[in-house]
Amino acid sequence: MVQPTLSTPPGRIQSVNLGSVRRLPVGDRTVMSAHGKRSVGGPVAVGPLGLTGDEQADLTVHGGLSKAVYAYPAEHYPFWERARREAGADVGLLDTSLPSGALGENLTVEGLLESELWVGDRLLLPGCELVVSEPRQPCYKFVAVMGFARAAKVMAESGFCGFYLRVARPGTLEAGQAFTLRPGPREVRVDQAFRLKMARRDV
């Protein structure tokens, strides 16, 4: 069997983002959410269940070994800013110019797109190793934070979902670090897995 070879470093961590659980207005009610994370500087410890200092409100759908870290491509931010502007989004928790972490991600990354990334690919960083596990699916809290009703539909149609990572080797990571991608089995791309998941549910 031929061993996968290392690619050239495809990108870097633009921002590391942590969030605390807080109240989020959703229509006429309030729910708890850690969405809308904030960028932090310096090394951050990462263990099997995620980044030290980060919280999740609903552990039935967030967190766990296979969803320890959520990453989102920085390349999609202009798309979401335009989508919110065209939809006349309620600014709510977010500014017109979206800050890193606005999509709920722990890692805002450069150089990794869902259409070019496969489930099982490995991100090799100086202080840890992460494995692509599955795409993220939008929920009603994402819609509330983004400020317009079609936000989940827009994510489904665009395929700009981001991806979860499990922690293969705990350690530390920080903004500005480059990473190397080690190919996995290359059976299912992240965008393909996302379409399959969304086809099984109503958006």
Predicted regions and their residues:
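Hydrophobic, well-ordered secondary-structure segments
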Residues: 104, 161-164, 176, 190
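A structural micro-motif recognizing beta-strand termini
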Residues: 110-113, 166-170
